[in-house]
Amino acid sequence: MAEFRIREKNLLGRGQELAFSTTLAGERTEFDLSFTEPYFLDRDLSAGIDLFRITRNQDELAYDLERTGAGLRVGYPVAKDMRQTLGYRFENNDIQDVDADASFFIRAQEGERSTSAVSQSLVYDTRDSIIEPTEGLITRLETEVAGVGGDAQYVQNRLGANYFYPIKDQWIVSLLGETGYVFGYGDEDVQINERFYLGGSTLRGFERSGVGPRDISTNDSLGGNAFYRGSVELSMPSGLPEDLGIKTHVFTDFGSLFEVDDSGANIEDEHSVRLSVGGGLSWRSPLGPIRVDVATPVLEEDYDEDELFRFSFGTSF
């Protein structure tokens, strides 16, 4: 994978932010360009625009997804450590190159579909660091409503929190919880690319999209309209020199993904909890946090897909 990022936080000496990033990997290609004015109209009001194009070759989902779009956003403080962001997004989604032997429920959704959506995000954040927090709390409530034009008609809600507590010097306990639900309205069902997916970095010990509703006749993951997940993690010194920025982690993850609008004898959709345990190492690199985790499932369904090793870049919440 090759990743390239440029961020100028004081464009032309006016405090404006311009960011460009591109990711080239075997399974996805991403281009993102964003501009933010932090003091729009000389007020504590941020305004921004985002442009993006994302192509994902999703072998585990039996189809490729191409997303092209743009968004506008405005953010403002509502209380100490609390900020509200309002946004609008328009994008074109193209489900393409569907495998010939893919699930009927996937093949039926092949083609282009536009999404026009308004959103809000309310964030409360008291963490001492965005990159490597040792104490504090971040909570996030997000709502997106699609149907202001476009083809998609759905309402998506997400609520999550992550709490960090130092039990002694460099020994940090973190607790994470998140849940979400999406539903269609009018005559529209929730489409496969609008659902939630669980696994990989969101539920270690399981493959990306390895948990949740599945067409067992083709072994294709279908995503779910509802999910919950949680994690308990202990971070501690690795025993190596502190200036290397390497830490050790032990954790347990749990969660579940369920509910699809499709129905049929071949769809497995259990609401049962999945649970895994594991450990890993993280490195505070100049480019951001890099982690290697090893995890194994303790509770799972027969049709779930396991994953032993997971490499990740960046923060998890």
Locate the predicted segments by residue.
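Short, glycine/acidic-rich beta->alpha junctions
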Residues: E27, D64-E66, Q153-N157, S272-V273
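Gram-negative/organellar outer-membrane beta-barrel architecture
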Residues: M1-I138, L203-G205, S209-D220, N225, ...
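Secondary-structure transition/capping motifs at alpha-helix termini
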Residues: N10-R14, Y39-D44, V78-M82, A161-W171, ...
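C-terminal outer-membrane beta-barrel translocator/porin domains of Gram-negative envelope proteins
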Residues: R89, D94-D261, A265-N266, E301-Y303, ...
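C-terminal structured "cap/appendage" subdomains that terminate the fold
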Residues: L257-E305, F309
